[in-house]
């Protein structure tokens, strides 16, 4: 899913510049690339500092979910900065370069809802693979950020906010042959529904679960949780196949006049993907 998308993208040699209101320009260096860990050396203690600074949540073993989140957000930030640098002010970009330093809006908040930023400085270590060094994470009121005239904005994933909300008027078309026939998908289905003798039972359970999920999402739109995959917003719906407790998450993508469902995820996979955008608050997917 989204964590597989990590291609290296470098800014064109002409270099991009962001127009400032006063007519000045801020140069975006050619060393910028979309892979956070190719862009900068990130010391492990910085992650622990961020966990302490941010509003508490479960980031998994060794902060694995946090690292995936930062990597995914940074990649999107590079894309948006490249795309919009010549069209908007630096305060509307998720990356700001000022006086040889780089500031990144993590999208995370402190307990008192201050924005948290990642501060990068040039890597002065000889023969360093990465051109930048993660100085640390700082809240917006921290003196370390006073020198920045502009603070970067949050990364956004949906160009149209309506994509984030389930439209109950649209039918769901499921690729049943793939969902119930693909070997990888089958490993996620409850064992009690597996086996040749249960193929009809599995299909009926799946079809019924999809109908029920759509009705529940129509009654409560917050039940549909967004994720970002393949450059598009998808929604995750809970599937209850054998009990009232969700066992799988159905991924649906809006097409022209309907939602296409092509795969199912485990609840853990669904949470990890959804957390790349924001912390899910709906109960069925919360850690």
Model-inferred region functions:
Residues 1-230:
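An acidic, glycine-rich, mixed-charge low-complexity segment common to nucleic-acid enzymes
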Residues 232-287:
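Compact beta-sheet-dominated globular domain cores
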């Amino acid at each position: 899913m989204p964590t597989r998308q990590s291609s290296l993208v470098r800014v064109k040699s002409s270099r991009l510049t962001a127009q400032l209101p006063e007519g000045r320009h801020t140069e975006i260096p050619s060393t910028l690339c979309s892979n956070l860990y190719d862009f900068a050396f990130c010391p492990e203690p910085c992650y622990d500092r961020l966990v302490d600074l941010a509003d508490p949540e479960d980031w998994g073993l060794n902060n694995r979910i946090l690292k995936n989140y930062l990597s995914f957000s940074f990649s999107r930030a590079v894309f948006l900065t490249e795309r919009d640098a010549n069209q908007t002010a630096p305060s509307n970009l998720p990356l700001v370069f000022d006086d040889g330093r780089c500031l990144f809006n993590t999208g995370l908040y402190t307990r008192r809802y201050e924005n948290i930023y990642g501060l990068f400085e040039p890597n002065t270590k000889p023969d360093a693979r990465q051109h930048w060094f993660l100085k640390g994470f700082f809240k917006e009121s921290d003196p370390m950020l006073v020198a920045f005239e502009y603070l970067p904005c949050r990364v956004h994933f949906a160009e149209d906010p309506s994509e984030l909300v389930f439209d109950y008027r649209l039918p769901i078309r499921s690729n049943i042959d793939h969902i119930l026939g693909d070997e990888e998908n089958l490993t996620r289905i409850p064992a009690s529904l597996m086996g040749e003798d249960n193929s009809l039972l599995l299909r009926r359970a799946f079809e019924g679960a999809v109908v029920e999920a759509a009705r529940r999402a129509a009654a409560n739109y917050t039940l549909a949780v967004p994720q970002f995959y393949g450059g598009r917003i998808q929604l995750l719906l809970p599937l209850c196949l054998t009990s009232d407790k969700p066992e799988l998450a159905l991924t649906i993508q809006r097409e022209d006049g309907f939602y296409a469902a092509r795969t199912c995820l485990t609840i853990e996979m669904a949470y990890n993907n959804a957390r790349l955008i924001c912390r899910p608050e709906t109960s069925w997917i919360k850690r």
